[in-house]
């Protein structure tokens, strides 16, 4: 069984007020924070690194953190690693507060070894594929994953147009692995979320559509309901 998970991408936030921006979307109903890490090599853009994640973790504790005596908003940190040689970053990001390390299939020579390395650090392991990568590459790996990510834009920049022709990949994964968390990332908003939900995605990354919304709660609630409706129709809703 799976559940709807909304993971706003902090790439679309106001970095001058990052902690407050994250509290805003968590209080509006976000489940995870999607943290895009780009190295300027695997993708042309550069975003943020471990010091920012460490700092943000102090502002946004893990759910269930007993030391959170101030009752700060909490969230699961979903780190999307758009980097070359992702193996070299696993230990650092596990230490700085990542809850999940999502690597790109295209960036590693031995994805299964990388999954085992990630899990050995006590965090969840996920694998992403670019639009040009066949979904077939995930079939042997999926039983070992906590999540699969199907990119619905070319990775590297926010605010791109949703690629509807990626939905057959999601449909295939949901049919083969009904209880796997399947994430979509890129161009997701009120107009496109029904297509992603119908295909079988349950983890939704949304950036500008949430962070710049007049009412983030309304957007997040709509997304959750669309995903819940489709999961319910498949008898998969947790």
UniProtKB/Swiss-Prot annotation:
Pfam families for this protein:
Ribul_P_3_epim
> Binding positions for substrate?
9, 80, 156-159, 185-187, 207-209
Look up the domain of life of the source. Eukaryota
Keyword Transport, does the record have it? no
Alphabetic keyword roster: Carbohydrate metabolism, Cobalt, Cytoplasm, Iron, Isomerase, Manganese, Metal-binding, Zinc
Q: Which residues of the sequence carry a binding annotation for a divalent metal cation?
A: 34, 36, 80, 185
Tell me what else is known. Answer: Present with 3310 molecules/cell in log phase SD medium.
Name-wise, this protein is Ribulose-phosphate 3-epimerase
Origin species, per record, is Saccharomyces cerevisiae (strain ATCC 204508 / S288c) (Baker's yeast)
Taxonomic lineage from the root = Eukaryota, Fungi, Dikarya, Ascomycota, Saccharomycotina
């Amino acid at each position: 069984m799976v559940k709807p998970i909304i993971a706003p991408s902090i790439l679309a936030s106001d970095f001058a007020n990052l902690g407050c921006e994250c509290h805003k979307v968590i209080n509006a109903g976000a489940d995870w924070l999607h943290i895009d890490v780009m190295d300027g090599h695997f993708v042309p853009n550069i975003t943020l690194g471990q010091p920012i994640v460490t700092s943000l973790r102090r502002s946004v504790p893990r759910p269930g953190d007993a030391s959170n005596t101030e009752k700060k908003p909490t969230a699961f940190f979903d780190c999307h690693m758009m980097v070359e040689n992702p193996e070299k970053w696993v230990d650092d990001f596990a230490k700085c507060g990542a809850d999940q390390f999502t690597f790109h299939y295209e960036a590693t020579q031995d994805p299964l070894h990388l999954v085992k390395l990630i899990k050995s650090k006590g965090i969840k392991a996920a694998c992403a594929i670019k639009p040009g990568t066949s979904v077939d590459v995930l079939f042997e790996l999926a039983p070992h994953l906590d999540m699969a990510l199907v990119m619905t834009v070319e990775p590297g920049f926010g605010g791109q147009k949703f690629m509807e022709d990626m939905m057959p990949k999601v449909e295939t994964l949901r049919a083969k692995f009904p209880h796997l968390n399947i994430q979509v990332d890129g161009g997701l908003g009120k107009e496109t979320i029904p297509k992603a939900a119908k295909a079988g995605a349950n983890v939704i990354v949304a950036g500008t559509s949430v962070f710049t919304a007049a009412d983030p709660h309304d957007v997040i609630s709509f997304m959750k309901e669309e995903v819940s409706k489709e999961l319910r129709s498949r008898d998969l809703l947790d």
